[in-house]
From Swiss-Prot:
Gene3D superfamilies: 3.30.300.20, P-loop containing nucleotide triphosphate hydrolases. It is found in: Cytoplasm; Cell inner membrane. Residues 9-177 form the Era-type G domain. An essential GTPase that binds both GDP and GTP, with rapid nucleotide exchange. Plays a role in 16S rRNA processing and 30S ribosomal subunit biogenesis and possibly also in cell cycle regulation and energy metabolism. Residues 200-284 form the KH type-2 domain. Belongs to the TRAFAC class TrmE-Era-EngA-EngB-Septin-like GTPase superfamily. Era GTPase family. This is GTPase Era. Coiled coil: none annotated.
Amino acid sequence: MSEITSPHRSGSVAVIGRPNVGKSTLTNALVGAKVSIVSNRPQTTRHRLLGIATFPEGQLVLVDTPGLHREQKRAMNRVMNRAARGSLEGVDAAVLVIEAGRWDEEDTLAFRVLSDAGVPVVLVVNKVDRLKDKTALFPFLAQVSEGRTFAAVHPVSALKRKGLDALVGDLLKLVPEAEAMFGEDEITDRSQRFLAGELVREQLMRQLGEELPYATTVEIERFAEDGALLRIGAVIWVEREGQKAIVIGKGGTRLKEIGGKARLQMERLFGAKVFLETWVRVREGWSDDEAALKAFGYE
């Protein structure tokens, strides 16, 4: 008797939610590699990117997005919201990521955007490992599901990679029978040059004060292979001279630490030795300037 095998499935899934619920951590966990930067700060993700998760049964092309939020005053906020909404075009399904024990107005906004898109939505309740009272999860799920339709509901811990197998199984059911869109060794549609800039920005988000990271962006001026060595030149842009001094730090100590930690992350991701140079420059008001945002690669 011949063995019956399940058909191969392949499709795209948007990962949507308010800021700081763990969308990028979930994307990285499903891909099995770091394709999206993460920090404890809201709005760490500014760009839409694809994370490619390949399994024996199929392939999920995950569209990681900036967090949907109500703030629209600054150009940067508008750009990020456009990127998040635009990620729903042509996808087969979507994941709504929320935080266990919390549902607020921005979660409602995200659900409304998904409802308007008309795609199947899987609710992922992340950070369940942080719940002190695990029995509180079930009434919370009942409350969130009341009056809302989900294709499936999955409590998970993306950070600890708990509950992901069942999630993958349900997502594969929602995408069509098709051949893989990407090769098995591909993990993202973004270039190493782009990822290098993101890894520097990740360190800015982690090492600087409360507001300053949001006034910074990173531009890769040089990315070249020199034998087995990658030579990378990164410009950190800020909006004021005072911010420049803070990023550099006394005697250049903070900039050195930012560059050193970013370099180690690059070497781990790229599998090569990296020579990284960093500079800090000022462009006043760049984060509220549509032309500047476009020049820096924001969609």
